[in-house]
């Protein structure tokens, strides 16, 4: 596995479950699964003009983790830094009904929700591992 850093830009939406799963899966990758490779990028800061976020995305590959069909992470990266290396689309992975379900507080997550987070985290890791 290459030692290259990879930016992971999660959905920041709070209206749907897909956003919550996106953020929790990204955190799991960053803290547990690929702590030496994953660098999380903050979407609100990115959009607001955060040069550090934007410059990182110009220099390193970025994986966008999209919670819904708006694809805000991909759009922001393409607008401010260039193409994303890959996309994890939660609606495609878990189903649109799941991605667009009512959001759940982190403290109210069920085992089923945690399983969804694990599925998305594994997909992020698979995409990271394909980057040589």
List each language-model region with its residue ranges.
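Iron-sulfur-associated redox domains of electron-transfer enzymes in respiratory
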Residues: 1-132
């Amino acid at each position: 596995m290459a030692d290259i850093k990879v930016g992971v830009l999660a959905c920041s939406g709070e209206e749907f479950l897909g956003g919550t799963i996106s953020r929790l899966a990204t955190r799991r990758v960053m803290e547990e699964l690929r702590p030496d490779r994953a660098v999380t990028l903050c979407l609100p800061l990115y959009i607001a003009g955060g040069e550090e976020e934007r410059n990182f995305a110009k220099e390193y590959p970025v994986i966008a983790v999209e919670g819904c069909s708006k694809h805000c992470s991909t759009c922001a990266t393409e607008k401010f830094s260039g193409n994303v290396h890959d996309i994890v689309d939660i609606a495609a992975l878990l189903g649109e009904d799941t991605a667009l379900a009512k959001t759940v507080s982190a403290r109210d997550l069920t085992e089923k929700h945690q399983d969804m987070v694990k599925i998305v985290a594994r997909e992020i890791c698979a995409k990271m591992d394909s980057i040589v």
